[in-house]
Regions:
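Active-site and donor-binding regions of nucleotide-sugar-utilizing enzymes
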Residues: 1-62
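Short, solvent-exposed loop/turn segments at secondary-structure junctions
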Residues: 7-10, 32-35, 57-59, 75-79, ...
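Nucleotide-activated donor-binding/catalytic signature segment of Leloir-type glycosyltransferases, i.e.
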Residues: 137-152
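Structural alpha-helical scaffold elements that stabilize or flank donor/cofactor-binding regions
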Residues: 20, 118, 158-160
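Conserved acidic residues
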Residues: 25, 68, 163-164
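A donor-sugar binding/catalytic signature common to diverse glycosyltransferases
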Residues: 3, 154-173
Length: 173
C-alpha cells in the first residue's frame, strides 16, 4: 500500500502512519517540510527511499489566469456539526450555527464595509467559497453586492487559477 493523501499533513501522525502500524510501501508527500517530517526515521520508521516528494498532481494542469478576484475559502469545523445523517449522507449542523464564532467571523468579514469599499475602489470582486460541508449553510450568511457565493461543485482549479488572492484559515485550500 502507498499512502496518498488529499492534503498536506499538519499534525504529528507518526503513531497512526508509522511503520509499526501501517507498514506502507511508500508515502507520497506534497511539500518539502512535509517530506522532511516523514523522513524522520525515529518518528515514522521508514527509509527515505520510501518517502516520495511529488507535489500535488492535481496542480500539474493548473493554469494561471489571475483576475481581480479575492477568494475567501474557510474550512469546516467539526464543532459546527451535530451528527451524521446516514440517509442523506451529510452532516447536520448544530442548532446554534448562526451564533458560532465561525459564522460571526466570516459573516462579519464578507460584509465588512472597509473590505467592500476597498474592493469597489480597486475594481476587485470577492468570492466566498467555504468547504463543501459548510456550503449547505450559505443561505445563512448576509449578502451584499460585492461578494459572490460559490456553491458546492464549483471547480477548485478555476477558483485557484482566476484568483489573485486566496484567503483561508488553517485548511489546505
Amino acid at each position: 500500500f502507498v499512502f496518498l493523501q488529499h492534503g498536506i499533513t499538519k499534525n504529528d501522525v507518526s503513531n497512526w502512519l508509522g511503520k509499526p502500524n501501517k507498514n506502507f510501501f511508500g508515502i507520497v508527500t506534497t511539500a518539502k517540510p512535509e517530506y522532511e517530517f516523514f523522513c524522520k526515521k525515529e518518528l515514522f520508521g521508514y527509509d527515505t527511499e520510501n518517502i516520495w516528494f511529488t507535489g500535488f498532481c492535481r496542480y500539474d494542469q493548473l493554469f494561471d489566469n489571475p483576475q481581480k478576484i479575492i477568494s475567501i475559502m474557510p474550512t469546516w469545523r467539526r464543532y459546527l456539526m451535530d451528527k451524521w445523517d446516514d440517509k442523506k449522507d451529510v452532516w447536520t449542523f448544530v442548532p446554534d450555527f448562526e451564533e458560532s464564532d465561525f459564522y460571526r467571523f466570516y459573516n462579519s468579514l464578507i460584509n465588512d464595509e472597509r473590505l467592500i469599499n476597498a474592493a469597489k475602489k480597486n475594481g476587485y470582486k470577492i468570492q466566498f467559497f467555504p468547504h463543501p460541508t459548510i456550503s449547505a449553510k450559505l443561505d445563512s450568511f448576509d449578502k451584499n453586492e460585492v461578494v459572490t457565493f460559490l456553491k458546492k461543485g464549483t471547480p477548485y482549479k478555476d477558483v485557484f487559477a482566476n484568483s489573485s488572492l486566496i484567503i483561508t484559515d488553517y485548511s489546505s485550500a
